[in-house]
Amino acid sequence: MKVGFVGWRGMVGSVLMQRMKEENDFAHIPEAFFFTTSNVGGAAPDFGQAAKTLLDANNVAELAKMDIIVTCQGGDYTKSVFQALRDSGWNGYWIDAASSLRMKDDAIIVLDPVNRDVLDNGLKNGVKNYIGGNCTVSLMLMALGGLFQNDLVEWATSMTYQAASGAGAKNMRELISGMGAVHAQVADALADPAGSILDIDRKVSDFLRSEDYPKANFGVPLAGSLIPWIDVDLGNGQSKEEWKGGVETNKILGRSDNPTVIDGLCVRVGAMRCHSQAITLKLKKDLPVSEIETILAGANDWVKVIPNEKEASIHELTPAKVTGTLSVPVGRIRKLGMGGEYISAFTVGDQLLWGAAEPLRRVLRIVLGSL
């Protein structure tokens, strides 16, 4: 099997390569090839593969020699080569981090700890397009998959606290630049214990509203603020990110024909690479909290139920704790005042791992027959 990698140098691609190295995945790949859009003929990264030269990612004939293509190059790349590649007669596996093909009928959204049955059926039935899901959707399902898999959810609403990484590497840099720029405005005043906090606050507020604040990528301040809209405006009051929550969750679960209603608001906050979500669920039956926790904890190897206590919550349910790990903690689980079927939950997950690279890494192994 020849496996071609495109977009392996970008943020998601780099995380994917690191994870594949950690898990010794290249030992399961008979022949690996690396493609580029900008450095054709250059030296390929060395993961022990025979092919040492970078190939042209826009050359359909070269791509067509692959049995599997894994791309983290983005949606524009997918739109530019995918159909031409299929039209050339190529019948290989296309594994893609971008959203372009997610909702196509001949594509499966990959999240094997949650929908391995859907993946296995797809492989049996000749499906060749395996697409990574929206990061918040994947992270929500990793945390709450037990309830969805047992068909216990009547509806759910997710209010998100999404990290800068979801918008890209430049946006992560801009967040840090913003933090530093805010501090620089008031560094001297902060160093004076007798300084007025109201004066400091006014200087910060004035700076956030000024044209000097670095906001070329987000368009508005994030450090010291938040952004209550993510992705394009669908024109009906909903953002595309919010729309994805319902349609992608149901597609992942194989329930597009009989969907569970899921909606909410998506908000960008000043976290680096962990998305958090506050979720309200209406269950189909009134279950004890202890039973709900047992169902959640048993769903996969990465979800971690955090006791609904202050100390556990503030130490375990934060981006600072979770970033860079595969752990998906879920806590703040309790009955809400509206009735016994109404449950709250709060979950955190790394947007670049289970939110992006890890499902692709694992579906590659599944397609190769080694997971």
Curated annotation (Swiss-Prot):
Binding partners and assembly: Homodimer.
Organism: Neisseria meningitidis serogroup B (strain ATCC BAA-335 / MC58)
Similarity field: Belongs to the aspartate-semialdehyde dehydrogenase family.
Name of the protein in question: Aspartate-semialdehyde dehydrogenase
GO BP term (any one): diaminopimelate biosynthetic process
Binding residues annotated for substrate, in chain numbering: 162, 241, 268
Reaction equations catalysed: L-aspartate 4-semialdehyde + phosphate + NADP(+) = 4-phospho-L-aspartate + NADPH + H(+)
Enzyme Commission number(s) from the entry: 1.2.1.11
Record keywords, A-Z: Amino-acid biosynthesis, Diaminopimelate biosynthesis, Lysine biosynthesis, Methionine biosynthesis, NADP, Oxidoreductase, Threonine biosynthesis
Enzyme class at the top of the EC tree: oxidoreductase
Domain of life: Bacteria
Pathway linked to the protein: Amino-acid biosynthesis; L-lysine biosynthesis via DAP pathway; (S)-tetrahydrodipicolinate from L-aspartate: step 2/4; Amino-acid biosynthesis; L-methionine biosynthesis via de novo pathway; L-homoserine from L-aspartate: step 2/3; Amino-acid biosynthesis; L-threonine biosynthesis; L-threonine from L-aspartate: step 2/5
GO molecular function annotation: aspartate-semialdehyde dehydrogenase activity; NAD binding; NADP binding; protein dimerization activity
Active site positions, chain numbering: 135, 275
Function: Catalyzes the NADPH-dependent formation of L-aspartate-semialdehyde (L-ASA) by the reductive dephosphorylation of L-aspartyl-4-phosphate.
Binding site for NADP(+): 9-12, 37-38, 73, 165-166, 193, 351
Record-listed phosphate binding positions: 102, 244
